[in-house]
């Protein structure tokens, strides 16, 4: 099933929905970072959440950064997403892996930890970015995001995120949804949706059966006048470049850069998001020193 993200409404706009299949996207992120199974599930859930949330941005220049740091062996997960549905991200410890939880599922909460915060940073080109922050609720990520929306944005929400890791460590299925009740929505409608969400199979199970994201949402919102508003293809895409990495190297400061130059060695930097290595020769480090720090 090809990746697809859709925006929709139900019950005459009382409910706002963003849903997506993200199997290929998550596969690419997990491949780039060579993740162990539990780390793959954690990174995949965050990538899916980022793709969903990024599409709420108003401008193509805006960015949304999602961070969760709970003190666990995952050492945090960071995602950056954009309005067109493309995302990039990394997990601090890609080898993080522990025994399944009591339900026999990959223990994402166990590697994330619960002693920390979930941050949502929206950079809309203003002087300061908007930063929303809540304590980690469960460490399972979906429930933490629902808690964030309810507490920080006063929008009652249900967030479902799923990643099914196959025996060969590839991603068999991945996807998710954000369902939000709009101001003035019928409380009984919210109760009905909550009941349905408890009764349906997991999103990874539905994707594995070959259901499209539209069919999954039609199944959840049967008899609720679901209307698909738009669809896009989400993807994992890193926009790193030699120029950006050069600026990052220059930003460490003249003193530290001079120390690197004086060692007479080449300097290698890796992109956090895609692991691509950029090598700067001794002469190139000297050029950076001259270009950024020589007195004009």
Curated annotation (Swiss-Prot):
Instruction: Give an example GO molecular function.
Output: unfolded protein binding
The set of disulfide-linked cysteines is 238-240, 271-274
Superkingdom of the source species: Bacteria
Which biological process annotations from GO are given for this protein? protein refolding
Q: What does the UniProt entry say about where the protein is found?
A: Cytoplasm
Q: Which UniProt keywords apply?
A: Chaperone, Cytoplasm, Disulfide bond, Redox-active center, Zinc
Task: Please report the PTM annotation for this entry.
Answer: Under oxidizing conditions two disulfide bonds are formed involving the reactive cysteines. Under reducing conditions zinc is bound to the reactive cysteines and the protein is inactive.
One Pfam family this sequence matches: HSP33
Q: Which InterPro entries match?
A: Heat_shock_Hsp33, Heat_shock_Hsp33_C, Heat_shock_Hsp33_N
Q: GO cellular component annotations, sorted alphabetically?
A: cytoplasm
Main location as per UniProt: cytoplasm
Question: Is Chaperone there in the keyword field?
Answer: yes
What is the annotated role of this protein in its UniProt record?
A: Redox regulated molecular chaperone. Protects both thermally unfolding and oxidatively damaged proteins from irreversible aggregation. Plays an important role in the bacterial defense system toward oxidative stress.
Q: Which NCBIfam families match?
A: PRK00114.1
In the record, the note on similarity to other proteins reads: Belongs to the HSP33 family.
Name of the featured protein:
33 kDa chaperonin
What organism, scientifically named, is this protein from? Clostridium botulinum (strain Hall / ATCC 3502 / NCTC 13319 / Type A)
């Amino acid at each position: 099933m090809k990746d697809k993200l859709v925006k929709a409404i139900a019950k005459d706009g009382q409910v706002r929905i963003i849903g997506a299949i993200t199997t290929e996207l998550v596969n690419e992120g997990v491949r780039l970072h060579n993740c162990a199974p539990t780390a793959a599930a954690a990174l995949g859930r965050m990538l899916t959440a980022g793709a969903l949330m990024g599409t709420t941005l108003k401008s193509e220049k805006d960015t949304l950064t999602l961070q969760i740091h709970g003190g666990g062996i995952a050492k945090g997960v960071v995602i950056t997403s954009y309005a067109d549905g493309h995302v990039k991200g990394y997990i601090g410890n890609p080898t993080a892996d522990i025994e399944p939880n009591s339900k026999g599922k990959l223990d994402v909460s166990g590697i994330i930890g619960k002693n920390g915060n979930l941050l949502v940073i929206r950079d809309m080109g203003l002087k300061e970015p908007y930063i929303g922050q809540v304590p980690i609720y469960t460490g399972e990520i979906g429930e933490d995001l629902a808690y964030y929306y309810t507490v920080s944005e006063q929008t009652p929400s249900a967030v479902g995120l799923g990643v099914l890791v196959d025996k060969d460590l590839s991603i068999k299925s991945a996807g998710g949804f954000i369902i939000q009740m709009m101001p003035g929505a019928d409380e009984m409608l919210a109760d009905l949706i909550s009941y349905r969400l408890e009764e349906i199979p997991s999103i990874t199970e539905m994707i594995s059966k070959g259901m499209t994201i539209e069919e999954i949402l039609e199944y959840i919102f049967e008899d609720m006048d679901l209307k698909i508003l738009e669809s896009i293809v989400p993807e994992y895409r890193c926009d790193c470049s030699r120029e950006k990495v050069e600026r990052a190297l220059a930003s460490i400061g003249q003193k530290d850069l001079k120390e690197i130059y004086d060692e007479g060695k080449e300097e290698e930097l890796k992109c956090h998001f895609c692991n691509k290595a950029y090598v700067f020769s001794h002469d190139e480090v000297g050029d950076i020193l001259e270009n950024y720090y020589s007195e004009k």
